[in-house]
């Protein structure tokens, strides 16, 4: 499916940055309007991240117009905002395939395009990568420029300031564009600031500034006075003191939707030496009224008709596991004011909106700072509170040292509600929850649970809440639950005990998590025994012994990496018990799982009922 490009006459002339740079500057505002219109139609047909890209249209046009990409390096942070970049870098005709199996990648991806200089998906990485590229450019005397684009939300991450501190020390030429779309840093935007930014980035101002530094080098007292005077003058209209203290020359804030102002300011900044930061103000969802009014709700969207100004009504379905968690948290908080909900900037995705509204004093958004969120929970546990850290599997990776050092080592009762475990789908390898069972299982003092349905999920969350001898984790997938009838009464499960779900012959399937339904279907065809193991750690030793003693073959099934996962734990236990037995491990292979619809990926990897049955039949043949 492609669009009639004749509707976008200027965009039709800019399929690549080289073509874009041939256009007169006077047509750039029209190009931005057409690019926004194309993005609107494209995402409407394909689904995907939406509001962020609408806010970076003018910025993207200006960057590729001023900088000689791909020779000059452009590094995007996270990548939600990079759809306009993909459209302008030769992928326009394939944008309708974005996030689909075999289609355009949802984030900047090195394997996909030479214009994607660094593969991303998690936040806060851009400045570190760009700094290294700037150092490399200087070592090679390549004459190339390096630009990192980062949003104000990502600025809450510690890695960002680690990189900026290092950049200020190394003093290599690089530009950081701070895309501020939440008004969280400054409200000083307008013609005065646009004009001031162009003056401060201009050759005359910077020449005087650098010359004065040299003249005053031998007069430290006067030099310090001049420095403070400049800071106060800039501070009257710009909030750049923090960045200046880190060694950056700060310019802005300017209107990020004024493409001419962006072009002129960036042209000036190309000629500046040392680390620079350009602060721009943008509006997430710019140009589409519903997204401007609700940028969070329109952050990522299903397929929709832009002309209706509405997202399609959700089809009736079972509650998601995230919603099950959110309701459980509210139920517990009603009874215990010491229950605290902590999330690293994933309130909506983790199902915590209602909790945050009903229990604001018990809710904490730690921002995009996963390391802090984990240790924040540990501190509360020290004081007798019941912290619940709601976090995506892929983002818990970023707080792994804190999980070990600050939580498990001290046996602190922090409950981790781990969302998006297993195959996530369209967001691809940066977001698949493939590794959590493996990296948690090796940590002493951890109790790890994997529910097979939403009722087990509630009971396991309650079990973690009641457990006081160390950290617990309940790991569940993205999307709709199974439709199981929920038991309102919550009862703590005995730690490390599984449940036999079907009695069969010769083959025993040990299931971990929501693959249980597929295992039961496969078991019917194979007349196999099925156990819902429930606990990844500690394993149900007696149940494993019984299954091994009474069956010829054991099969473990999990939506996690086979290496180091629950199946590995079963093998280790059998070895300890001196019970050698053929064991088939079914799970995710030793590779990064690409993007696509979850059901497509599940089928391709043999994790649906038919795939499980076939793998077992092949193993015993």
UniProtKB/Swiss-Prot annotation:
Mg(2+) binds at residues 152, 181. GO terms for biological process: 1-deoxy-D-xylulose 5-phosphate biosynthetic process; isopentenyl diphosphate biosynthetic process, methylerythritol 4-phosphate pathway; terpenoid biosynthetic process; thiamine biosynthetic process. It is an enzyme of class 2 (transferase). It comes from the Bacteria. Pathway: Metabolic intermediate biosynthesis; 1-deoxy-D-xylulose 5-phosphate biosynthesis; 1-deoxy-D-xylulose 5-phosphate from D-glyceraldehyde 3-phosphate and pyruvate: step 1/1. Its cofactor is Mg(2+); thiamine diphosphate. CDD domains: TPP_DXS, TPP_PYR_DXS_TK_like. Binds 1 Mg(2+) ion per subunit. Binds 1 thiamine pyrophosphate per subunit. It catalyses: D-glyceraldehyde 3-phosphate + pyruvate + H(+) = 1-deoxy-D-xylulose 5-phosphate + CO2. SUPFAM superfamilies: Thiamin diphosphate-binding fold (THDP-binding) (SSF52518), TK C-terminal domain-like (SSF52922). The keyword RNA-binding does not apply. GO terms for molecular function: 1-deoxy-D-xylulose-5-phosphate synthase activity; magnesium ion binding; thiamine pyrophosphate binding. Thiamine diphosphate binds at residues 80, 121-123, 153-154, 181, 288, 370. Its EC number is 2.2.1.7. One of its GO terms (cellular component) is cytosol. The keyword Magnesium applies. Belongs to the transketolase family. DXPS subfamily. Homodimer. Catalyzes the acyloin condensation reaction between C atoms 2 and 3 of pyruvate and glyceraldehyde 3-phosphate to yield 1-deoxy-D-xylulose-5-phosphate (DXP). HAMAP family: DXP_synth (MF_00315). PANTHER family: 1-D-DEOXYXYLULOSE 5-PHOSPHATE SYNTHASE-RELATED, 1-DEOXY-D-XYLULOSE-5-PHOSPHATE SYNTHASE, CHLOROPLASTIC. This is 1-deoxy-D-xylulose-5-phosphate synthase. It comes from Shewanella halifaxensis (strain HAW-EB4). The lineage of its organism: Bacteria, Pseudomonadati, Pseudomonadota, Gammaproteobacteria, Alteromonadales.
């Amino acid at each position: 499916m492609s669009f009639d490009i004749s509707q976008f006459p200027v965009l039709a002339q800019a399929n690549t940055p080289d073509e874009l740079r041939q256009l007169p500057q006077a047509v750039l505002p029209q190009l931005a309007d057409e690019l926004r219109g194309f993005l609107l139609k494209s995402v409407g047909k394909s689904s995907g991240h939406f509001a962020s890209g609408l806010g970076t249209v003018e910025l993207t046009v200006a960057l590729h117009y001023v900088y000689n990409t791909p020779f000059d390096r452009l590094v995007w942070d996270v990548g939600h905002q990079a759809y306009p970049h993909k459209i302008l870098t030769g992928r326009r005709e394939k944008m309708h395939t974005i996030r689909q199996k075999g289609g355009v990648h949802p984030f900047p991806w090195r394997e996909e395009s030479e214009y994607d200089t660094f593969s991303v998906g998690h936040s806060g990485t851009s400045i570190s990568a760009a700094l290294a590229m700037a150092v490399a450019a200087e070592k090679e005397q390549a004459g190339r420029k390096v630009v990192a684009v980062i949003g104000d939300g990502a600025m809450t991450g510690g890695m960002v300031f680690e990189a900026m501190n290092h950049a200020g020390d190394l003093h290599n030429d690089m530009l950081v564009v701070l895309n501020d779309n939440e008004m969280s840093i400054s409200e000083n935007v307008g013609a005065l600031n646009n004009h001031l930014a162009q003056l401060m980035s201009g050759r005359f101002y910077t020449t005087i500034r650098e010359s004065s530094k040299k003249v005053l080098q031998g007069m430290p007292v006067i030099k310090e006075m001049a420095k403070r005077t400049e800071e106060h003058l800039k501070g009257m209209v710009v909030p750049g003191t923090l960045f200046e203290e880190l060694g950056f020359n700060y310019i802005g804030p300017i209107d990020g939707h004024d493409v001419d102002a962006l072009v002129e300011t960036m042209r000036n900044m190309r000629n500046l030496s040392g680390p620079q930061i350009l602060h721009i103000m943008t509006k997430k969802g710019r140009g589409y009224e519903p997204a401007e009014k609700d940028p969070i709700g329109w952050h990522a969207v299903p397929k929709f008709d832009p002309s209706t100004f509405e997202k399609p009504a959700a089809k009736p379905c079972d509650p998601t596991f995230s919603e099950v968690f959110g309701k459980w948290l509210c139920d517990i908080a009603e009874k215990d004011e010491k229950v605290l909900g902590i999330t690293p900037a994933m309130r909506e995705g983790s199902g915590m909106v209602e909790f945050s509204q009903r229990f604001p004093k018990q809710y904490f958004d730690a921002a995009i700072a996963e390391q802090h969120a984990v240790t924040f929970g540990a501190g509360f546990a020290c004081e007798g509170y019941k912290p619940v850290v709601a976090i995506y599997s892929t983002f818990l990776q970023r707080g792994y040292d804190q999980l070990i050092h600050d939580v498990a080592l001290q046996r602190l009762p922090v409950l981790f509600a781990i969302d998006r475990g297993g195959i996530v789908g369209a967001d691809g390898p940066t977001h698949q929850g493939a590794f959590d069972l493996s990296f948690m299982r090796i940590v002493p003092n951890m109790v790890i649970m994997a529910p097979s349905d939403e009722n087990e999920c509630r009971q396991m969350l309650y079990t973690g809440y009641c457990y006081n001898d160390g950290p617990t984790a309940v790991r569940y997938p993205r999307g709709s639950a199974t439709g199981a009838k929920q038991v309102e009464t919550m009862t703590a499960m005995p730690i490390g005990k599984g449940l036999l779900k079907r009695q069969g012959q010769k083959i025993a399937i040990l299931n971990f998590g929501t693959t249980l339904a597929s295992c039961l279907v496969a078991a019917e065809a194979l007349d196999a025994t099925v156990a819902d193991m429930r606990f990844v750690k500690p394993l149900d030793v007696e149940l494993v012994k019984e299954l091994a003693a009474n069956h010829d073959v054991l099969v473990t099934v999990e939506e996690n990496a086979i290496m180091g996962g629950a199946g590995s734990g079963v093998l280790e236990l059998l070895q300890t018990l001196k019970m050698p037995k053929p064991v088939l491990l079914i799970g995710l292979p030793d590779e990064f799982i690409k993007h696509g619809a979850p059901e497509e990926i599940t089928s391709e990897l043999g994790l649906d009922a038919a795939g499980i049955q076939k793998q077992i039949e092949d193993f015993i043949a």
